[in-house]
């Protein structure tokens, strides 16, 4: 388990006990991701360990919470794939107040166009910020 997956689980308020990770309760707990009401904007990048080089550096994004998760994690990778309907990696999901508002999925190349994706994400974050004043 890397530091990003631990952060994701801690942020969701989930216990990291191995026996609980395989229970049906864990799948319901993953649904908490869609209830991210304490953050206006959340960006989650889902990838596989074998495709790590295709990750996009999201650390420079402002005004949003950023998380990374691996579908290769033996404890909850399958639950992530099912919960978020992940068909290809990397996939980047954007949530606004817990509702998925944007999805970016890689094609056959297993890569995303970094410049285009970052521009679209930043534009969406700007829109979220503007909606606060409407």
PLM feature spans:
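Non-catalytic, surface beta->alpha helical segment in thiol-disulfide oxidoreductase systems
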Residues: 94-134
């Amino acid at each position: 388990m890397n530091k990003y997956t631990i952060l994701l689980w801690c942020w969701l308020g989930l216990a990291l006990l191995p026996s609980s990770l395989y229970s049906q309760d864990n799948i319901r707990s993953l649904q908490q991701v869609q209830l991210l009401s304490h953050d206006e904007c959340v960006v989650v990048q889902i990838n596989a360990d074998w495709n790590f080089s295709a990750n996009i550096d999201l650390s420079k994004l402002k005004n949003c919470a950023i998380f990374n998760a691996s579908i290769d994690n033996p404890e909850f990778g399958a639950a992530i794939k099912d919960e978020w309907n992940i068909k290809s990696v990397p996939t980047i999901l954007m949530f606004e107040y817990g509702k998925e508002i944007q999805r970016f999925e890689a094609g056959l190349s297993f890569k995303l166009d970094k410049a285009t994706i970052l521009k679209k994400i930043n534009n969406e974050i700007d829109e979220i910020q503007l909606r606060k004043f409407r």
